C-alpha cells in the first residue's frame, strides 16, 4: 500500500497538501485536489487512522465498556449506541470487562491511547471511575449509579418504579406469596428495584421474600431450584431480568408447574427474547434503545461544547404477556 509521501510524489504535490486534502483542514486548489484524489483512488491509499487521531487529538471513536456482552440487554444497548454513533460520524469500539476491574482499567488505558472522544460505561467500581477522572475524556455511566460521583453523567431507567410496578402487577393478578429474585445489591439498579418491591409489600401487607440472584440464564436455573425449595408456596416470582425469568419458567415446568396458573412470573428489561420465547414473558420494559442513543448524544454534545444533563432517567413500562394473568 502506498504511503502519503508516495501519493504526494505521484500527484506532484507536497505531503502536507495530501494531508490537507485527506483531513479537509485547509483550502486546496481544486486542480491539485483532483490530482491527489485520483492518485489515492489508483493506489488504494488509506490514511493511518491512529496517526490522524494522535495529530488531531480526536479519533471519532466512542468507547463502550460493558460487563457481559452475552447478556442481551448489553448487546441491544451496544447496537443502539453504534447506530447513533454512526449517524453522527463516529465509530464505536466495544470492550467486554467480565466485571473485572483490572480489565476495565486496561480498556480505559487503551481508549485513552487511541484518543477516544468519550466513554460509555457500565460498572459498579468506584475505583475505576476515580481513575477515569484523570483521563480527561467525557464519560457517561449507564444503568448503574455510583456513590460520591456527581460530575459524571448517568443514563438509566427508573428502577425503583420498575420494582413497584412488577410487584403491584403480581398482586393484581392474585398473588399472595411473591418472591423477588433480587440482583446483586452492590449494583444500584438492583438495589432500587428491590426497594420498590419492599415498599409495595409494605403497602399491601405482603410478606417480603427473596432469593439473591445474578443476571445470567445459567444462574437463573440454579437459583430457581433454590427458590422452589425454600418457598414451596410461592405463587408469584419477580425475576432479576428476562433471561432469569426464562430459566425460572424452564425449571418450574420441568417440575410439573403450570405457568401462569400455578405460579406467575415477571421479568425485567424487555429484551427481544422475552417475546420470541414461548410463552411470551411478562416484563417491565426498559427503553434500551433510547438509553443507548441518549448516552451517545451526551458524549457528542460534550465534545461539541454544549451543556449536558448530568442525570437522565427514563420511565419504565409494564408489558403484559403470557406468564401472568389478571383475575377475572
Q: Language model features by range: what are they?
A:
Residues 1-59, 325-328:
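N-terminal helix-turn-helix DNA-binding module of bacterial transcription factors
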Residues 2, 57-168, 227-229:
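Alpha-helical recognition/docking segments in bacterial nutrient-uptake
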Residues 12, 17, 44, 58, ...:
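Conserved functional loop/turn residues at catalytic and ligand-binding sites
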Residues 15, 33, 59, 78, ...:
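ATP/adenylate-binding site constellation spanning eukaryotic-like Ser/Thr protein kinases
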Residues 23, 68-71, 99, 183-188:
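Short histidine/acidic/glycine/proline-rich micro-motifs that form metal-
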Residues 42, 83-88, 137-141, 145-328:
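Bacterial carbohydrate/catabolite-sensing allosteric modules
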Residues 42-48, 102, 120-123, 221, ...:
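Short gly/ser/thr-rich secondary-structure transition/capping motifs
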